[in-house]
A protein has these predicted regions:
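Carbohydrate transferase catalytic cores enriched for Leloir-type hexosyltransferases
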Residues: 1-238
Length: 238
């Protein structure tokens, strides 16, 4: 409350802060961050990743931390639905991120129990906390990124994937729509059947995961970064 300005990363967050404090709302301004797209030389070869993380098929990537609102359950329910309704074939989801949440310390055990109970170990591969370079590399080589969250201030994984021209499968929460990924498909937060059909469709359509010429992606990302820097400097200088 003593600051002259409060920087927020989304209009959705600004609407939320309005409910909490009118004083804070009046001092809040939008600064929608942009991620720098990695150079190709900084992306690990897929063969290295396959050996390191023990997989050998195309995959979707889910890099969310294991917090309840990140909504991993809907992804597992989608896989269970595919397995029992359509005979699960060649769909793999690789998931990384911290599994510690002091608010819900038993959450990761519930997730592991669900995976074991429903025989999903062959299609859901949790690899824990990994180096940032590997996060970007797995994102680069994936069929698509998945973010099923129930809530976000502004999703950094979505912005990372956007910077790389990736396909993104998203829950239809307001901030995800606000982020406007160029290549995106949405499903309702709890609609595992819709998510299942999206996964099956994308698994069949796109096995390499790269949507554009990477030089074009880098050029567009540089433009986006420059525009962000200019807007940020203007905002803090006024």
């Amino acid at each position: 409350l003593y600051s002259s300005k409060i920087l927020l990363s989304s209009s959705s967050a600004k609407k939320d802060i309005r409910k909490i404090s009118k004083t804070a709302y009046k001092k809040s301004f939008l600064s929608k961050f942009v991620f720098k797209c990695p150079e190709k030389k900084d992306i690990s070869n897929i063969a290295i990743l396959k050996k390191k993380y023990k997989f050998n098929t195309p995959y979707f990537y889910l890099p969310n931390q294991y917090w309840v609102h990140k909504n991993h359950e809907v992804v597992l329910k989608a896989l269970k639905y595919i397995k029992h309704k359509f005979s699960l074939k060649k769909i793999l989801i690789i998931s990384s991120g911290s599994n510690e949440d002091h608010r819900n310390p038993d959450y990761i055990q519930k997730i592991k129990h669900y995976i074991s109970k429903n025989n999903l170990k062959d299609c859901y591969h949790y690899i824990g906390v990994i180096p940032y370079k590997d996060v970007l590399s797995l994102m680069y080589h994936s069929i698509a990124l998945i973010n099923p969250s129930k809530f976000e201030g502004r999703s950094s994984t979505v912005e990372q994937a956007k910077s790389m021209g990736k396909k993104i499968i998203l829950s239809n929460i307001p901030v995800h729509k606000e982020q406007k990924p160029r290549y995106s498909k949405y499903f309702e937060v709890g609609n595992f059947k819709k998510l299942a059909h999206i996964l099956m469709s994308e698994n069949n359509v796109n096995q390499n995961g790269i949507n554009l010429n990477y030089n074009d992606i880098l050029r567009k990302n540089n433009e986006d970064l420059l525009n962000y820097y200019k807007s940020y400097i203007k905002l803090i200088s006024e």
